[in-house]
Amino acid sequence: MKPVILFLHDPSTKPNANNNHILLPNAFEELNWETRIYNPEDISLKNNRIEFQSEPLPTKCLIWALGFGRKATTLDRFNILHNAPNFSFVTSVSELLLSHGKASWAEFLPETIISQDVNRIIEEISSGNDQWVLKPLAGSFGRSVHKVNNQDIKLVNSLFRESPDQFWVLQRYIEGIEHGETRTIIAGKEIIGSYLRKPEDAFRANVAQGGQISQTDLSERDRLVVEQIVPRLAEKNIGFAAVDTCEGFLVEVNIVNPGGLSSLQDVYSEDFSKKTALAIIKAKKIS
């Protein structure tokens, strides 16, 4: 009997998102797995059995959440998943919620302030002539990322007015990031590959914002950071992540369906999705 993996994918995901929902199921199918793809919106619970569109899941399967679905009902869906027995997750439900965002990895970041208080952020920016990067705590695709200094107080006030319920990250600008940051894909306990993301506008390297990609090797300083994060991901039961580094600093850890597999394929002319699937299977000890 084939092992089963279930992917949760929201078909309404914006078009600048990645194609993991295509690459990863194909990779598992090549490894003789049965793959199913469901919209997280269609989840229900009957007598402690998860169903999608009235179809019960196998007693045992591997679940890979490639997204949350609608924000308003995310906690309800994750509560159902978290309390259902006999399921194994590529990344645990609790960590998808608790480790999604910059705060979970603050010890590896450059000087960083995280706050919902605009006055606290302005106080830090106004304390000198330093350059900073201001971005949403749980942002993605490089949206709403701004390079700021003490001349940009009006912009900061405007951003906080537009998003009054949002926490923001103020991070000291990393000198050298204009030359690019390195994205490293981690699966299971293995480094799958790394590539350079060079920003189009001097500091936003996200490919969705026009960043350029090329082959690279992890520098010694960046490798030290990545090698400290890999075992922590495993301890937290986070099976798939993208780790962004620059000049020996962590820029970000993305654990919610991070892009990078197709970029690795583009720059190295090699399919990394099967290597990713094998690393997940090995980490989960599934034969």
Can you say where each PLM-predicted feature lies in the sequence?
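Extreme N-terminal starter segment of soluble prokaryotic enzymes
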Residues: 1-6
